[in-house]
């Protein structure tokens, strides 16, 4: 553990916690080969990357804690690697490390539960027109996409029908039945 014993003002031993990190975050996979229990996801995304047939939108569905957001980050890292799309990216990749840490300007993670209005989706649609700053692709990861309003889904539909070539979407949800069929039909599952 990242804890250590220290002494307080009275000389008593206390636990200090300078660098505590949740186990799930500490052991989060950094490569597709480390992703456990998601062989079908690794196979599908690996085939898309290796064949150069990367879809413009993906829908990741599953219970909480099964690796949807982690898979989205790994996918973003794989297709934005400096030397071209690859399933396994070296640990020393600057862009890859920034993506996995959530610090990359071109991989935007959005919480659908708190950013679910039509105006916010329209802003996203306007942002899509700008080219990526660092990466090959600008990737929008929308977590809990089922929480978007009907109007927000409709605002997103036009962008999904005619996406800019530099934009990819990854939608993650625990409740796919709440996502509009018109959105689902435009995504790779």
Map each language-model feature to its residues.
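P-loop/Walker A NTP-binding region and its immediately flanking N-terminal helices
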Residues: 2-189
